[in-house]
């Protein structure tokens, strides 16, 4: 491991210390919570910063693993239009990543979903068995 790799590993460890980044891949439906900082100017001229969180849920169509510059592309349909947004995996703006559904696909990049709509754009769901310690007792 060279100096650059060790530097990246230290920074990744620092950025993920208070975050849990799950294992996900292309085809999975994720919910990404993003921190948004709004800036407004009050009547007396002072600047006011407000912080809020916004959720973005969609299908991961591409994932790029490149150390600290890793990113993933999420696609969703909003008001009948396809919207894609790229998130940096280790960015401080990304508050949390939750996997909603696991999908079954045979490709690493799902760019073909851009040309499809309706039933042909659906992805089969992969069922993950619940671990024994997480099982709900009835």
From Swiss-Prot:
It comes from the Bacteria. One of its GO terms (molecular function) is structural constituent of ribosome. SUPFAM superfamilies: Translation proteins SH3-like domain. Signal peptide: none annotated. GO terms for cellular component: cytosolic large ribosomal subunit. Keywords: Ribonucleoprotein, Ribosomal protein. Disulfide bonds: none annotated. GO terms for biological process: translation. Pfam families: Ribosomal_L19. This protein is located at the 30S-50S ribosomal subunit interface and may play a role in the structure and function of the aminoacyl-tRNA binding site. Belongs to the bacterial ribosomal protein bL19 family. This is Large ribosomal subunit protein bL19. It comes from Rickettsia canadensis (strain McKiel).
